């Protein structure tokens, strides 16, 4: 699918400080690894995952998303008052209702008439949200 009037202006992210590496996990599982005769480094080799990151307990997805949104907005000249839609594509939500996107919308001080909603579809939620907005622009 190709879009004619759509492009990605900016991306933002916010990584948690708590890091647990595959090596850390393997050290914790050392006795099990020995019993099973598994070589050290097996976890990363099999999964391709070098590290995992975790937020502190009590941190809400909207807080992290708002920081990522500010990061993205800080890298562009787009006036936030011209943003007409915000979709939260995360699996994680603050609550069942209201939509997590509504909290992010408030935190980012977007226009009151901007469309806001959540799309949750595992790893594809973000991509689904991007395609949905692109269709709203181009179709």
Q: Can you name each region flagged by the protein language model?
A:
Residues 85-91:
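Short glycine-rich or small-residue beta-strand-to-loop segments that form or flank ligand, phosphate
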Residues 41-46, 50-62, 91-139:
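Conserved catalytic cysteine-centered active-site region
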Residues 1-84, 106-108:
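Conserved "HGTGT" condensation-loop signature of ketosynthase/thiolase-family condensing enzymes
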Residues 9-12, 89, 120:
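Short beta-strand segments
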């Amino acid at each position: 699918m190709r879009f004619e009037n759509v492009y990605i202006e900016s991306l933002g992210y916010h990584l948690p400080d708590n890091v647990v590496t595959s090596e850390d996990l393997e050290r914790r599982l050392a006795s099990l690894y020995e019993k099973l005769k598994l070589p050290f480094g097996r976890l990363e080799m099999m999964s391709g995952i070098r590290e995992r990151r975790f937020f502190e307990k009590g941190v809400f997805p909207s807080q992290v998303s708002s920081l990522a949104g500010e990061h993205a907005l800080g890298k562009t000249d787009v006036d936030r008052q011209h943003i007409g839609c915000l979709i939260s594509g995360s699996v994680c939500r603050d609550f069942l209702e209201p939509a997590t996107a509504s909290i992010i919308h408030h935190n980012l001080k977007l226009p009151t008439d901007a469309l806001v909603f959540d799309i949750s579809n595992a790893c594809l939620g973000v991509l689904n949200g991007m395609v949905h907005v692109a269709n709203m622009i181009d179709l």
